[in-house]
Amino acid sequence: MNILHLVALSLFPAAQPAPAAAPLKVVTTLSILKDLAREVGGDLVQVESLSDPREDPHYVQPRPTLMTRAREADVFIEIGLQLELWGGKVVEGSGNPKIQSGQPGRVIASAGIPTLELPQQLSREWGDVHPFGNPHIWLDPLNAKDMAANIAQGFERVDPAHKSEYEERLKSFQTRIDNALFGEALVKEVGGRQLARRARDGGLDNWLKDKGLSDKLGGWLKRAAPLKGRPIVTYHKSQIYFAERFGLKIPIEIEEKPGIPPSARHRDAVVELIKKQGVKTILEEVFYERGAADYLAKETGAHVVVVPIDIGPDVGIATYFDLIDNVVNRLLESEGAAAGDH
């Protein structure tokens, strides 16, 4: 090797690989959104949630510490539908221009998803009514698919270079939801899109029967089949999407009105209804006090089942799939135990 060659090598060193792009910094209001963001983003995102799954998601305090955590976010994800009014205050207080309303980094996970209990008119007399419909959309697995799609679109807006990766991971997640809900064999034969459409219009059972496919239904829907048509009582209107998907009935809530604890008169009305309709299960979220539910159980013999509606180590639920598994299993246990009591 001559001197000129050595000089050339010193002037033009071997090209070094470009450093990997830093992951997107993602902040979510709820841990369930953190899980969906990780499903879609994988190693391309770094995600943190602002709330504790043991907290009522309506009433998180928009503390300065939360604003600080959102200050460097590339993407901010919320459910929307006025579930987390505190989220908007956190964003405004963060001073982060990338995640303000209308910016590419602001993701509303509920966008375009049909809601239940959309009020025809509003009045303070009705309690904490949500003007855009019930916001607890994530407890229907089909809605979780659409929420993940909204999150993927948000990531693609901010990071278009990795669009194909986000779309691939979204497709994988949506297929896993279909398999978990309908059973893998039925999804392979019919396709998740067809099954989801039939389930949304309420005609899945009849359609499967007409096609001779009823025996191939699996997943959560098969496991939860014994719950179909069963009445349960809930504390708040948190479970209506779950009940709609799995065919349960909720004739009354323990709350007299949304956000308003029960009066003695309303509590007595709930006791009467539980006895009249043979309700066996009182389903309550982890952040509500047990007093009213325990009283109803004592008066009627119904079982109180306490479940989280968000995920995290503090509530023993690691993923979205675990969340739905837990509610299905706990209800089956309660209804089975109730049946064995009589």
Where are these regions (language model features)?
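Bacterial N-terminal signal peptides
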Residues: 2-14
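Extracytoplasmic metal-acquisition and chelation regions
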Residues: 20-342
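Signal peptide processing junction and immediate N-terminal pro/mature segment
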Residues: 15-19
